[in-house]
């Protein structure tokens, strides 16, 4: 595979929220983010949101040279965030129970998703809007139990990461493409998808003992981008 320079890369920063100070993180977000956090019912959801948003501001600040609390975001019609004054800086944020991950790149649109590996998905509830008919058939033919749950988790995170990269809604975007290979018989840890006359790369893997991450990016040259890790003690994957 052709090598990739650091200038053509995705930087991932992530961690477990228990490793960060909630008080310090609270002071690292702006008032509308604090208001959003206060509306969340579960304390762990509040903590994950507060830590993730403050770390997003910190990481973007180091890249663009703007103080964290001065960074301004805008959103498209589907809620995808971008920077007001730095259109070439692309980022994506995902958080789940006690963990978060941030993807940042200067090169291309990017999306990331993280899920707790032992999260239980009810296939019947999500299949109708999340998976194509081929994907539903594939999952239904798997043995019930751990194998099906692992494949649902992999499929879900890959599709959500790509939808975030595309900047569309989950409901309208997830069924517009299939993650399965051409034979509709397996879900790959690395794959490329043609969507809307563009090429997107997807890569997935386990991180730490209990989390699963997928990253999607627009990859016009059919080259897997270099994944660079910052402050993550257990690297997820590295492609070059």
Regions found by a protein language model. Name each.
Residues 1-240:
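Core catalytic alpha/beta fold that binds nucleotide/phospho-ligands
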